[in-house]
């Protein structure tokens, strides 16, 4: 079920949303690198995912082999450089524009020009986030709803510079993850 053109996924932020998004991508067969400024938070996120999977196995909702395979696809990243070869980056960090713009500028310098850089933001302008990014056509919003593993809807948010091809690629990826993509323009509250 893995979307091959976006084979490796990186998730930045390991709170509730970041962990849920990492679980969704790993469940779809992607190797997932998880980065957080607090390395212990990444370990806690993976432990939380393991606990939720164990509960599903105990209830007969998931085979233990599937749970083990999903967990084996989750990899802690100890610095942003470890995300350099990701095909898709999903940022789920602090909802502060200055944090996101600095982070996306760093990612643009580290990752290949073909890497799709996305934010899970629900309120910050994608156009503003992309303003300082080389190749801003690859920047988009990928807004999951909480809890990400359960909720089917994902907003694919385009900024002024986001290319149609990037939006299409993200919609195909999200559909491959069993989610329902909804295309949105970057406006207040989408």
What residue spans do the PLM features occupy?
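Hydrophobic/aromatic beta-strand patches that form the interior of the parallel beta-sheet core
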Residues: 33, 75, 90, 140-142, ...
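Rossmann-like NAD(P)(H) cofactor-binding subdomain of soluble oxidoreductases
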Residues: 93-154
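Internal alpha-helical scaffold of NAD(P)-dependent oxidoreductase catalytic cores
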Residues: 30, 156-187
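NAD(P)+-binding Rossmann beta1-loop-alpha1 motif at the extreme N-terminus of oxidoreductases
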Residues: 1-52, 59
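A structured beta-alpha segment of the ubiquitous adenosine-cofactor-binding alpha/beta core
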Residues: 56-110
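Short beta-alpha connecting loops at secondary-structure transitions
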Residues: 34-37, 152-158
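Phosphate-coordination loops involved in phosphoryl transfer and adenosine-cofactor binding
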Residues: 5-8, 86, 114
């Amino acid at each position: 079920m893995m979307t091959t053109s976006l084979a490796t996924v990186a998730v930045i932020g390991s709170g509730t949303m970041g962990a849920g998004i990492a679980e969704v991508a790993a469940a779809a067969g992607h190797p997932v690198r998880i980065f957080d400024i607090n390395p212990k938070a990444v370990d806690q996120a993976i432990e939380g995912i393991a606990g939720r999977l164990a509960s599903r196995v105990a209830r007969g909702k998931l085979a233990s082999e599937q749970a083990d395979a999903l967990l084996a696809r989750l990899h802690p990243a100890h610095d942003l450089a470890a995300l350099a070869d990701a095909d898709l980056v999903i940022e789920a960090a602090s909802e502060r524009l200055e944090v996101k713009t600095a982070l996306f500028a760093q990612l643009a310098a580290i990752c290949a020009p073909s890497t799709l850089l996305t934010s899970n933001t629900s309120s910050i302008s994608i156009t503003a986030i992309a303003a300082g990014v080389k190749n801003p056509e690859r920047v988009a919003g990928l807004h999951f709803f909480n809890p990400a593993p359960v909720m089917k809807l994902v907003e694919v948010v385009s900024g002024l510079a986001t290319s149609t091809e990037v939006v299409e690629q993200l919609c195909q990826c999200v559909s491959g993850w069993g989610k329902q993509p909804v295309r949105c323009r970057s406006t207040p509250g989408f």
